[in-house]
Swiss-Prot record:
Its EC number is 2.7.1.130. It comes from the Bacteria. It comes from Klebsiella pneumoniae subsp. pneumoniae (strain ATCC 700721 / MGH 78578). It is an enzyme of class 2 (transferase). GO terms for molecular function: ATP binding; tetraacyldisaccharide 4'-kinase activity. It catalyses: a lipid A disaccharide + ATP = a lipid IVA + ADP + H(+). InterPro entries: LpxK, P-loop_NTPase. This is Tetraacyldisaccharide 4'-kinase. ATP binds at residues 55-62.
Amino acid sequence: MIARIWSGESPLWRLLLPLSWLYGLVSGVIRLSYQLGWQKAWRAPVPVVVVGNLTAGGNGKTPVVIWLVEQLQQRGIRVGVVSRGYGGKAERYPLVLDDRTSTALAGDEPVLIHQRTGAPVAVAPLRSDAVKALLSAHDLQMIVTDDGLQHYKLARDREIVVIDGVRRFGNGWWLPAGPMRERASRLQSVDAVIVNGGVARPGEIPMRLRPGMAVNLLTGERRDVSTFTNVVAMAGIGHPPRFFATLESCGVQPVKTVALADHQALSQADVAALVTADQTLLMTEKDAVKCRDFAAANWWYLPVDAIMADERAQRLLADLATLAQR
């Protein structure tokens, strides 16, 4: 229903317009208060790069963060990541992740980023606290913040916005009548716009998500995903249909698809009930980090990598590497 409202297919968005106007007013006043100096942002002693979005829902932001961190690491840059840690509930903040930190404490995306990149990661409701904790524990040249474009309490040196190239901005209205957190004109003030799928417009960096080999959660075995049959597909991400479409593009026709809420906590009983012994459960890598401690032999996940071959992506990386080495 929400997807139909935000896309403009359902007329119910009109009923939510008063709340959207209020949301837009409040968000605009908050940003203006920082621009005019009424509120002060905390500035880190190292450059901060924000990877965020203008809309609610999955846009492919986490794969971009992983891509960015890995590319900077290949250039010799010591980079750390901070996040709000949605879906996690630690006893105290800030929380600096280690290899044993669970998604129940830190949230699924921070754990995934840490496992994929090996980069230092910290979470806290106040992102400046997470930055301070990282810098106290590690000698870093740059901080990447996963989400937080609208978290103006943390000063930033570069802003990168990720857009779903198919859905873009839906009906264009602020939450809750539409998907917008800020007006589309905000793109004019950011340093780079990355478009996930669809068709990139002039000045935007096109990106696609390339699926890898399916990985068994229990054994680590890798297999071509197209060899699977009798598949149940599970996705607890911002936009589950994207994962299901990816499977179909790989030649997989699931007998059942299960769309879960983003950051939803998962239990062994709940997940096991989705699949029979003769079926294969295929899930996203983001879901897999929540299931590793109780995985079964027929549970697999499909990792994806962000691919950006555009020259503008290379210019962005060169700019960030130069910024980190100042």
